[in-house]
């Protein structure tokens, strides 16, 4: 049974402006150290934008937004061996998912020329 659903779309230009203005500080604000290690050197904007959208979608699926101790650092997007994204909840986000009875987490991330988008589904 679906108990949480979130979707987000992010403009690549918005993320590019933030990266240009704040550089590494911006990435460190929204990404975990493990996510930062995977930023592609050649074109980081789609990667960062996709993770931003994924985290926004995740907090919508949790029903909290970025509140109750849930931050960008309590949500982490890693990769499976297949290359598919994997959503991990940490800290307060993990506590919230457990209190909801989350047993399954599904995530889809995409990006095009101008936008990045993500959908998160939480199952019981």
Swiss-Prot record:
E.C. no: 2.7.8.7
GO molecular function list: holo-[acyl-carrier-protein] synthase activity; magnesium ion binding
Keyword set, alphabetical order: Cytoplasm, Fatty acid biosynthesis, Fatty acid metabolism, Lipid biosynthesis, Lipid metabolism, Magnesium, Metal-binding, Transferase
Gene transcribed to yield this protein: acpS
Organism of origin: Maridesulfovibrio salexigens (strain ATCC 14822 / DSM 2638 / NCIMB 8403 / VKM B-1763)
Homology family: Belongs to the P-Pant transferase superfamily. AcpS family.
GO (cellular component) term, any one: cytoplasm
Taxonomic classification: Bacteria, Pseudomonadati, Thermodesulfobacteriota, Desulfovibrionia, Desulfovibrionales
Subcellular localization, as worded in the UniProt entry: Cytoplasm
Residues where Mg(2+) binds: 8, 56
Keyword Repeat recorded: no
Pfam families assigned to the protein according to its UniProt record, in alphabetical order: ACPS (PF01648)
Protein's recorded name: Holo-[acyl-carrier-protein] synthase
Reactions this protein catalyses: apo-[ACP] + CoA = holo-[ACP] + adenosine 3',5'-bisphosphate + H(+)
Cofactor: Mg(2+)
Protein's job: Transfers the 4'-phosphopantetheine moiety from coenzyme A to a Ser of acyl-carrier-protein.
Main location, first listed in the record: cytoplasm
Domain of life per record: Bacteria
Biological processes, Gene Ontology terms: fatty acid biosynthetic process
